[in-house]
Amino acid sequence: MNDLIVRLSSLTLENIKNVKKGTVCVPITGITKAGVLGIYGQNGSGKTAIIDALYFLQQIMIGSELEPEIADYLDSDSDHAEITAEFIISSSEKALYEVGYHVQLAKADSRVWINREFLNCSVTKNGIRSNKNIFMD
């Protein structure tokens, strides 16, 4: 599996900063070309929430300890927040992988912890797509 290219295809946030629930879909214009040049929108539309959520997601996925400041980014009216990221991974073997990662963060007082997470994947090879299987829950 050489020459893997990983692209974010969608990001769903729930109770992150000012976003109660929202999904951003990233159009994949070409697997080998850059697709996103910037994020724009009205003030308060969730642009910073997207960037912050991607940072939290990165920290969680590499196994870093959750920073205490993350509690400030979770909606104060809710005891949990959720981030779901969908990725498209292409390989030189002409296989296409659709990978999803979901994490639910729980909050009490100023503490935040991972309450639940799961990872799923499907493979498309030779035009045949497998069902999405959950690998971790």
Regions found by a protein language model. Give the residues of each.
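Short acidic/polar mixed-charge low-complexity motifs
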Residues: 20, 93-97, 128
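Conserved P-loop NTP-binding catalytic core
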Residues: 38-40, 51-110
